[in-house]
Structures are given as structure tokens and as C-alpha cells.
């Protein structure tokens, strides 16, 4: 854990304890390529060394894959997911070709190449064994959800526009969930 993470944990712990709230630990370990159990264990040891206590057991995302699967099933039932067969390099090339590619806060957004594929085209690619990720059709999802907001204790009602993130990936071929989906499910649970 680096100093910034330690500071954030101390700040969150103090804020929770000051108002009688709960301080919970969640290990976001779904990326098996970068996450190691030893890293997670070291984080817990560091928090303990800092003298922090937490409410409930340490939650590990890798223990909750079934919950994320149920969330994907629900999104599929709402017809807001679609398979995306594009590789990262294909997406970069498509964005480079577009003069005015849409951009979010973290750079260019997915251009929606596979969003416009027909059901037959999607089925044919899947039948050929083409790997794919599942993306959230943000336009459809926002039409179902309507305006979104959240409450900040200091600033009051704050509008939220997830459409700025574009059609996010909710599951990949190598991981049954994505960060975007997992943190939403976990935030709701916690």
C-alpha cells in the first residue's frame, strides 16, 4: 500500500467513525493478471498496522463472481447488453479514423462499432468462435433508468451522467465481470 492509499484509508476510517458509520474493506481482485493474494494480504496487514479496525469481514470480489453473473443475467433480460468483438487495436484504429470521435474524461470512448450489428450478425460471429466482451448499451440503459443523482452530505443533490463513460464493458472473455459492473454490485451490497 502506498502513502496515498494509506491516507485515503485513514481519512475514510476517521470520517466513518466520527459520524457512527461503518468502515468496510473491499479487495478488488478480479484482474487475475495483476492481483495476487499476497498483495491483498499485505494491504490488510498495513491497515492493521495503522491501527484501523473495520466492520465485518474483508470482502474480496473474487468471492462474489456468482453475484456479478446474476447482475449480467438481469441486464441481459433488460436487453441492454450486446457482444463486442472488437480488439483494443481495432478500437484504437477506428477512433483514429474518426475526425470527431467522442471523448470522455479518460480519453476516447468506444465508437459503438458492434452496437449496430444485427442479432444474426452477432450470432454468426459467436458461432464462429469469435471472442467477445459484453458491453452496456448506455443509451438503452439511460432510457430505462431516467435521470440519475446522488446525495452529497455537504453539497446536497448531485446529478450524475454515466453516459459520459460510453458503452462500458461489463464482462470479458478472460474475466466473468468487469471493474465497472463489480463495483456497482458491491457498492449496492455494502
Residue ranges and their predicted role:
Residues 1-102, 188:
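N-terminal Rossmann-like or analogous alpha/beta NTP/dinucleotide-binding catalytic cores
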Amino acid at each position: 500500500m502506498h502513502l496515498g492509499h494509506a491516507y485515503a484509508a485513514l481519512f475514510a476510517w476517521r470520517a466513518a467513525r466520527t459520524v457512527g458509520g461503518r468502515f468496510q474493506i473491499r479487495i478488488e481482485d478480479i484482474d487475475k493478471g495483476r492481483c495476487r493474494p499476497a498483495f491483498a494480504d499485505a494491504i490488510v496487514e498495513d491497515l492493521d498496522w495503522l491501527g484501523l479496525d473495520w466492520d465485518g469481514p474483508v470482502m474480496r470480489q473474487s468471492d462474489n463472481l456468482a453475484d456479478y453473473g446474476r447482475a449480467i443475467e438481469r441486464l441481459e433480460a433488460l436487453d441492454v447488453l450486446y457482444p463486442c468483438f472488437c480488439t483494443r487495436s481495432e478500437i484504437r484504429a477506428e477512433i483514429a479514423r474518426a475526425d470527431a470521435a467522442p471523448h470522455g474524461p479518460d480519453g476516447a470512448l468506444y465508437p459503438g462499432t458492434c452496437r449496430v450489428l444485427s442479432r444474426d450478425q452477432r450470432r454468426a460471429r459467436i458461432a464462429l468462435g469469435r471472442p467477445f466482451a459484453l458491453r452496456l448499451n448506455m443509451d438503452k440503459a439511460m432510457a430505462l433508468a431516467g435521470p440519475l443523482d446522488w446525495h452529497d452530505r455537504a453539497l446536497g443533490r448531485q446529478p450524475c451522467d454515466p453516459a459520459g463513460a460510453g458503452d462500458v464493458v461489463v464482462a470479458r472473455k478472460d474475466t466473468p465481470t468487469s471493474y465497472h459492473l463489480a463495483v456497482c454490485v458491491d457498492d449496492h451490497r455494502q
